[in-house]
From Swiss-Prot:
Function: Required for disulfide bond formation in some periplasmic proteins. Acts by oxidizing the DsbA protein.
Assigned GO CC terms: plasma membrane
Transmembrane domains' residue ranges: 15-31, 50-65, 72-89, 145-163
GN (gene name): dsbB
Gene Ontology MF terms in the entry: electron transfer activity; protein-disulfide reductase activity
Family: Belongs to the DsbB family.
InterPro entries: DiS_bond_form_DsbB/BdbC, Disulphide_bond_form_DsbB, DsbB, DsbB-like_sf
Subcellular location, record wording: Cell inner membrane
One of the Pfam families matching this protein, by short name: DsbB
Keywords for this protein: Cell inner membrane, Cell membrane, Chaperone, Disulfide bond, Electron transport, Membrane, Oxidoreductase, Redox-active center, Transmembrane, Transmembrane helix, Transport
Oxidoreductase found in the keyword field: yes
UniProt name for this protein: Disulfide bond formation protein B
Cytoplasmic side: 1-14, 66-71, 164-176
Periplasmic side: 32-49, 90-144
Amino acid sequence: MLRFLNQCSHGRGAWLLMAFTALALELTALWFQHVMLLKPCVLCIYERCALFGVLGAALIGAIAPKTPLRYVAMVIWLYSAFRGVQLTYEHTMLQLYPSPFATCDFMARFPEWLPLDKWVPQVFVASGDCAERQWEFLGLEMPQWLLGIFIAYLIVAVLVVISQPFKAKKRDLFGR
């Protein structure tokens, strides 16, 4: 399996598949926000940023999968997936165990050099409450679904990093 993951990390297909899944999740989030009129909270916005990190890592990996740039993509992927797990876990705990003393911020705090909420307010402005349960599917809230998704991204990222020393088998069709 590790050889297979190593082989996949050297090709564009797996990176583009990861980019497609992250983009599909981002578009789904925008659909929930603008069509279903659900209000994203600050943690939702941060989770969205972590997902953009996974998307960016996938695009970097797809650009040059056979060069050392692939390792940069893996580091960004690991960091974004890890932060996504942290954020969605915190968000899940806020929803499962609401407390007046444990709340999220009123607005997202982006660095001064990257004010995403000012540049693209349709995507990055938070207007909801983190503890409010707005949507449920199969008994799970949205942060719980995202927690599973980010855990999957993180597990695959760790396996891909571990697989890097394992070289792919050369398959010779006629056994020479």
